[in-house]
Amino acid sequence: GAMTALVELREQGVVRAISVGLGRLEPLERFTAEAPLDVIMEAGRLTLLDRTAEERLLGLAAARGIGVIAAGVFNSGILADPDAAPYFEYRQADAALLERARRLQALCADRGVTLADAAVRFPLRRGADAVVVGARTPAEVDAFVAGLSAEIPEELWLALEVA
């Protein structure tokens, strides 16, 4: 099948890695458990608001030597700025989720950190090997790069864990 052909291409050096990227965890878990993958990309499940990939996927990937890329770290915008983009999973966020995101934002602001910077760094802290973000402008790219070196105190991470 297709996976056999991909493995052959990898062995021949035609491709360097075999990867699968999905937003739904169930099929991604199955691929991670059964397929000869090098890397997986999860979307929106290793975030400050949704940590299901941490619970269900990271250990399995590590045990099989599979790298993890986190995408969708803003959960459709709410973790970039809850008031400017109150969306979660491409829909209007409900009041409880919006309030939770605002609490996270306030915790960050109290310590001089943007919520977006914490959202981008969170998956790396939890075991992801890389993060994918989308930028619309060069200024957004610059902000993401600057955020990677922003000082985020350990005390903030601890507060975000329980928020």
Language-model region placement:
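Beta/alpha (TIM)-barrel catalytic core signal, keyed to glycine-rich beta->alpha loops juxtaposed to Asp/Glu
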Residues: 1-162
